[in-house]
Amino acid sequence: MKEIVTPREMAQMDQGTIAAGTPSLQLMEKAAAACAEIVALGLTILDKVVVICGSGNNGGDGLAIARILAAEGRPVEVLCTGQPQSMTPDSQANYSRLLEAEITPLFFDTLTEAEVFALFKGAAVLVDAVFGNGLADRPLSEKYRQLIQGMNASGTPITAIDIPSGLRGDVGRTLGVSVVAHRTIAIQYIKTGCLLNDGPDYCGEIIPVDIGITKGGICNHKGLLEGEDIHFPKPRKNNTHKYTYGAVASVAGSAGMYGAGVLCAQAAMRVGSGLVTAFIPREGADILGMKLPSEIMVQAYGTDFFASDFESRRWNAVLFGPGVGRYHDFGPFLKYILDGQSPVIIDADGLWHLERCRQVLTGHAAPLILTPHLGEFSRLTGMDAQTITQDPLTIGSRFATEHNLVLVLKGYHTLIFSPEGAIWFNSTGNPGMATAGSGD
């Protein structure tokens, strides 16, 4: 699992490491060496590298990267966006080292648009070291808009240092325009902005590099889930039977949406449930019976569903919601299953019903998982979607903690919030899942 941090957390860790005795200039040199190694991947010794450097410490990283690559005998050009006097102290130190290495930088303000574009087109790779992850939340000036648009328009592959310039490091929103990188080198840890909102469309491949920054007491419970983190399926003993692996009730599907019932019941069986029963309105029982494999039981229900059918069975897990429709009053049923001990998963129309009886979330006994997309979560919280996207980690974590549940907020990097405050980013999303039925 790769650790994920916010820019604020990263700054605190950075400051703590410096306070503990590691000079900031030494950290910058380590970061530059690690980045230079990755920038050089796939390049020949004759391929030109153009490093575009801002005036902050991200630009200082870029100046050091350029010096290291040039020392290897590679053709390197440096384009600075500001004069030396506007640079941070560490950047000024690396600017001086660059001059000592007999590398003369170019300055963006002294070149024509055509000259800048020719510089970009003539490179094998551009290194974006203009802005770091602490970029203020305000539109970029016209100067930087032109610079970034020129980088993107050149068609030259771009490697961004820490985060693409123009992308907010906290929530992954662009500030009007952003570098579109084919690769982003994350210093020490991946920043949240690389994975949230627009981040994945601008960061390309994300490669973290360890430069020895310590956490210094900063508690971080965010991680990017990878294949080796998922221990599934678990080994099974030979002397077992169907009830060893649990009985699942799938309450999904209704007139016009019977497919939801099929998808949910099949999914429950495929993950290894010992016994799956698909509950469906009486008029759809024959349809499900024909569509589902024979090992899945179909239980028809009518208006007496809650009293006569469901209470008579004990379930190891209950799935409720996809395609159940909005014409039946499921309030009493929700209260019943949430007062029980069996884990409950609620999705889709089930969340719509939950909105109308939110009081059942208070003090619920059953372990609970909610799986909304952004629109459904907006309705659950009463907050507009735009507000949520500006701070999804805080809002999602608070909701999961306050209601003692697991929140699975679906998206490209689906966010999983635990009631204890941990946050996991799913790494397997893809735009092909943007179709009806993926949630089911």
Residue ranges and their predicted role:
Residues 110-113, 165-169, 192, 304-306, ...:
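Short acidic loop-to-helix transition motifs that present clustered carboxylates
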Residues 1-80, 88, 183, 194-345, ...:
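Small-residue (G/A/S/T)-rich helix-start motifs and N-terminal tracts that mark the onset
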Residues 124-125, 130-222:
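Internal gly/pro-rich beta-alpha loop/helix module
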